[in-house]
Amino acid sequence: MKELNFESGLVTYSINGACEVSFNPTDSNFVERLYSTFEELDRKQDEYKAQVEKLSDKREIFDYVHERDAEMRGMIDGLFATPVCDALFGNMNVYAIANGLPVWCNFLLAVMDEVDTTFAKEQKATNPRIAKYTAKYQKYRRK
């Protein structure tokens, strides 16, 4: 049987050397899930801050923090359809701060930057490639 192979745009990325994820950074379905997940996590971040400020008992705070950490890890793992959080964050809470932002935010912003960069690059490559094939097959067009 003959086999046809084509470029799907699927790219595998090593994330901080801890794990790998694969996605097509120009896939609108993935990008929509990425932005929806980011917005939901951002909303939960605001709720998290407000709730932690309300709680006074340390044990209640820690229980709440663990619950929210697990919830957010599930959302991030769901975005990539594979468990990535344990490898990326280990025992660190995803609300931990690094470079002024929660670590979950740093991770998703890095993915968003890759999406933006790749999309711009692919857009530039698309028009010349289409023109090349249009010219190639133009000679077969009936007049």
Q: Whereabouts are the PLM-identified features?
A:
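Intrinsic disorder/low-structure terminal segments
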Residues: 5, 12, 22, 79, ...
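C-terminal charged interaction modules
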Residues: 82-143
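Short N-terminal mixed-charge amphipathic segments
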Residues: 1-58
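Surface-exposed polar/charged interaction patches
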Residues: 44-47, 51-58, 79-82, 114, ...
